[in-house]
Amino acid sequence: IAVSSLALALAACQSMRGPEPVAQANIPQSYTASASGTSVAAQGYKDFFADQRLVQVLNLALANNRDLRTAALNIQRAQQQYQITANNQLPTIGASGDVLRQDQGAGAQTRYNVGLGVTAYELDFWGRVRSLKDNALDSYLATASARDATQIALIGQVAQAWLNYSFANANLKLADQTLKAQLESYNLNKKRFDVGIDSEVPVRQAQISVETARNDVANYKTQVAQAQNLLNLLVGEQVPESLLAKQRVTRITSNNTIGSGLPSELLNNRPDIRAAEYKLSAAGANIGAAKARLFPTISLTGSAGYASTDLGDLFKSGSFVWGVGPSINLPIFDWGTRQANIKISETDQQIALSDYEKSIQSAFREVNDALAVRQNIGDRLSAQKRLVDA
């Protein structure tokens, strides 16, 4: 009978959590535009980016960025929280000792006690502690995946800021050259006006062009300063001048043939999707813990040690004492609190499911956007070159 009861309890433990919901992201089997080549997920940033100055800047950012440091500390915190929750599956053993002097009417006595005890070890028949452990593990894995997502986002932000600084510098130099040309044109028109060859109209027009060019120079100086400030913030320290690109960067990646992959690969390659999936799993574990609270909490308490009224006889064989016993606790009427907790956990799971589906859809959109830009980048570059030549 005891074995059957234990088997029934273990079966109940396994059924508390319930089935995991199935995500309905509704994404196509292929992208609107595709590209063949090496998957970017298989490349590290050191191989992906061609300019070694950018690679060194990224190394500094990964070592010093405060957001990434916070994400790493969150992992440590989640890991310790998981360890605490996992330890709840094991009994807590403590040592105790006391001396009691009392008088119960027959003369004062001194009693000495020393021993070991197990304090309220919960027998997890319904899987409550196990569900809490699963929740802590999934939360830890979600935090680790979120840190990976933060790192990938940081790499993209630093690379973009580094390139923006390069472009702003190139535009500033072009604006300086334009200003010099406009000043030369103004001086020429001023001389022609002074000797009476031309009217004042060309002088005024040239002066307007000069002031416009000066305004452009001031704007681009501001852009250079802002780009450098943002880059320093992302990196977490002042970026050395030797690592900054003063000229326009013409080659960004080492490999011009980057494959798009398949939408199904996003689930494994995107850490933000993995983080959302782990959060969904953690929400499911919370449901199991909430349902387990509907059943009695059974705890075991035990102790063993020595007790004597004479300190010299404390550790003799006749002074050994022990005790063990279970306790059971079941709230009879709690005004629906436990049922409400289950409903809250189920709602949290639906929220996590919605977030998971959104993360898949957002990732799919981001890939499609990048492919759309890449598909038309050749036409845009050709148009820009023709515009410059004209």
Give the residues covered by each predicted segment.
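Outer membrane beta-barrel translocator domains of Type V secretion systems
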Residues: 94-128, 132-146
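Periplasmic alpha-helical coiled-coil/stalk elements that build and connect Gram-negative outer-membrane
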Residues: 129, 145-262, 373, 377
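Sec/SRP-type N-terminal targeting helices
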Residues: 69-70, 86, 123-151, 201, ...
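Terminal intrinsically disordered/low-complexity segments used for targeting and assembly
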Residues: 1-63, 133, 137, 221-268, ...
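Short, acidic/charged, Gly/Pro-enriched secondary-structure junctions
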Residues: 69-87, 96-100, 281
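Short loop-to-helix capping motifs
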Residues: 51, 64-67, 122, 157, ...
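Short, conserved catalytic or interaction motifs in soluble domains
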Residues: 15, 123, 160, 236, ...
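Small/polar, glycine/serine/threonine/aspartate-rich low-complexity segments that form flexible
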Residues: 35-36, 40-49, 54, 59, ...
